[in-house]
Amino acid sequence: MSPIPHIEGVLSADEVVQTAESIASLQLDTGMIPWFPGGHCDPWNHVETAMALDVAGLHGPAERAYEWLVDIQLPDGSWWNYYLPDGSVEEAKLDTNVCAYIATGVWHHWLCTWDRAFVDHLWPTVQRSLDWVLSMRKPNGTPLWACTADERPWDYALLTGSSSISHALKCGAQLAELINEP
């Protein structure tokens, strides 16, 4: 396991842990971590919060966060854009960047915990998400930003979203190599 990061004179390890504990206090029994009490959650920011929990050594809550994503993943490998605490969908858009990011989070979890069994458990979810993202490419390979709930793709891509997808694909490739997946 990694030591708690800190920046001398700016942010102490205790402050990092306190921040992570405040994030963990928002976590629902389902594993969802809303933006604020009673607020919504999107899978991209949800992965970011799980990564923050891992950095602070709160691996149990981080794993519960990933389990929530396993539980709510759609059959095609995607996730809706925003969820509410009651489990309902607030925004039924499918965003490629949001769906790809779990690969980044699971790779980060591996680097923080070296828990191969958890990686093995999450791999099918990661693989389905990346397969869905790759199905959303233009003929030149550029990943489209999103599609509507009725599966009509938007006709453009975002630089920031595509950059995040590129990073997630690299993390997914590293995960596949780790578990000897072709």
Which sequence ranges carry the predicted segments?
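A short glycine/small-residue-enriched secondary-structure motif
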Residues: 69-87, 99-104
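Primarily a tetratricopeptide repeat
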Residues: 64, 121-124, 128
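The feature captures the catalytic groove of carbohydrate-active enzymes
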Residues: 21, 28-39, 81-83, 90-100, ...
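Low-complexity, Ser/Thr/Pro/Gly-enriched N-terminal "stalk/linker" regions
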Residues: 1-44, 55-79, 140
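Glycine-rich loops and low-complexity Gly/Arg-rich segments
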Residues: 59, 128-129
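Well-ordered alpha-helical scaffold segments within catalytic/enzyme domains
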Residues: 1-9, 47-61, 101-118, 164-181
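Generic structural signal for bulky hydrophobic/aromatic residues embedded
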Residues: 26, 52, 72, 105, ...
